[in-house]
Amino acid sequence: MKITHTAIEFAPVIKAGGLGDALYGLAKALAVNHTTEVVIPLYPKLFTSLHEQDLFATQKIPYFFAGEQEATAFSYFYEGIKVTLLKLDSQPELFEEAETIYTNDDAFRFCAFSAAAAAYIQKEGADIVHLHDWHVGLVAGLLKQQPCPQLQKIVLTLHNFGYRGYTTREVLEASSLNEFYLSHYQLFRDPQTCVLLKGALYCSDFVTTVSPTYAKEILQDYSDYEIHDAITARQHHLKGILNGIDYTILDPETDPHLAKNYSKVLFEDPKAFFEAKAENKKALYETLGLSLDKSPCMCIISRIAEQKGPEFMKQAILHALENAYTLIIIGTCYGGQIHKEFSNLQESLADSPNVRILLTYSDVLARQIFAAADMICIPSMFEPCGLTQMIGMRYGTVPVVRATGGLADTVTDGVNGFSFSNPHDFHEFRNMLSKAIATYRDDQDKWQQIVRSCLEFSSDLETAANKYLEIYQQ
């Protein structure tokens, strides 16, 4: 089976968030037994890991968007995946000068790329075309209008239903969509407005989200009734599939960045397991200038944005200071009031012996924190899937979370973590934190049971890939 994915980011080459990681993991697992290709835009200024000698083939691709255009397809293989980068030769201003993946003109840029991607897929053929998020929503309509050779199914995965790709009718008129297919993207209440996600929902054969609970939650999203109508119309062809994580890379037994390696097997002797965690904690505290004592360590490894619950993060800081345990927050935070507030907190707590805020991100440091921490706090307002709770469990770090989306699917209160429900109740959140801290301090038997359940949790890439294959083959 030939499976072609298209998106605007792919972690080994370029990424801005979880979409790139999720696509990489899925494609890697599918490539073991199937011909798998990923088609993304070429961002010359942003690629850092790609060298010209890696490219094994090029071809010219004519496409239509705001007139007759031409693209060049560059391809190479990465871990069994054919990666194709499309360079829009006739419209170089759209991607070649981009300093970031996302800009102020994303709808037009991504529609131009989608037109080129659809033309490439029509030429190359595919059994399954798998689209990722609204950015490539136009591909669905173009391939329905003019299917590629041997096309059996178009699958759309919603990594974040909150982003939808609102744009003008004029942008879609620049493509070769006829009036019938263009109407799938239009809003009835405002025919001059189109929504790339809306059209993709109607033009795809099957829709998935990245967790079962999130699939249920989006059916209750009434923020735009026309988008609600579109997702409701597809509810019998909608399924939530939990993302997997790469256990070959995320493995505390072999992770080269840890001060002390350890494994699930080591937990047969809990004392030895926790001693290994303690060695990692000691090394991390020395790096961050924290005071080492017997108090628990909680971490937050997350973008600091509205979705991630910044007000709860601030409550966690207060709770840590009041209850004398360590809290480490690491994550990027871009502009606005949230950035200002957390920058002030970072500065005011710079000399705190037990709270550290790092407004940056390092994969190496993140793994060292996973290995050292006793708990990871994830107080998201919504969370389509979430990977950090699964990585935490892999490293024997107990998740304390809000029960939403993929967090609700992976963390059971009192079994393999702790959870709260109300997205507006600080009291419930603080009670959950107190319960987790008290369990660690006062009930070691219960704590060991919870850590054991974390280590026994499994959500690997192969399991997720097999569920997608079931959809492909239906």
From Swiss-Prot:
Which superkingdom? Bacteria
Q: Name one GO biological process term.
A: glycogen biosynthetic process
Record-linked Pfam families: Glyco_transf_5, Glycos_transf_1
> Recorded GO terms, molecular function?
alpha-1,4-glucan glucosyltransferase (ADP-glucose donor) activity; alpha-1,4-glucan glucosyltransferase (UDP-glucose donor) activity
What reaction gets catalysed by this protein?
A: [(1->4)-alpha-D-glucosyl](n) + ADP-alpha-D-glucose = [(1->4)-alpha-D-glucosyl](n+1) + ADP + H(+)
Pathway this chain belongs to: Glycan biosynthesis; glycogen biosynthesis
Q: Report the EC code(s) recorded for this entry.
A: 2.4.1.21
Positions that bind ADP-alpha-D-glucose: 15
Q: Which UniProt keywords apply?
A: Glycogen biosynthesis, Glycosyltransferase, Transferase
- Entry function: Synthesizes alpha-1,4-glucan chains using ADP-glucose.
Q: Which family does it belong to?
A: Belongs to the glycosyltransferase 1 family. Bacterial/plant glycogen synthase subfamily.
Give the protein name, as stated in the record: Glycogen synthase
**Protein's gene:** glgA
